[in-house]
Amino acid sequence: MKFQLPTSKVFSTLFLFQFSFRGGFMFDNSRYITKGINEELPLNLQILLWSLVDTLLVEKDYLQIFNIKVIRGNLLEITHSQEKSPYKRTIQAVGNIDRDMKVYIIDSQEYSTMLFAE
């Protein structure tokens, strides 16, 4: 099933306004992960990071930043931030990782990619 937008001038103007000024459909495209993410970041944490971006209520920046710190054992502290439309939120989660990590999710308009900052 293919979705087609209405072609009226009023709708086009409103659509452009929403897309330009409200973040519109940023991160609403194909999603990819790098080999490093696939090998080192457990699937449950990958899904959590994507969902944090999906549920963000402020205007989204093309670059989403996640600092993941091991508190003890499998207890993690995840700080999600962005620079444009400043945003910062810290949560705790459970996951099995061996080291602290910095993860980016970048939207290039055609697709979104999750990758390590290093």
Regions found by a protein language model. Name each.
Residues 2-93:
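N-terminal "domain-start" segment
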Residues 83-118:
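Short, compact, well-ordered microdomains
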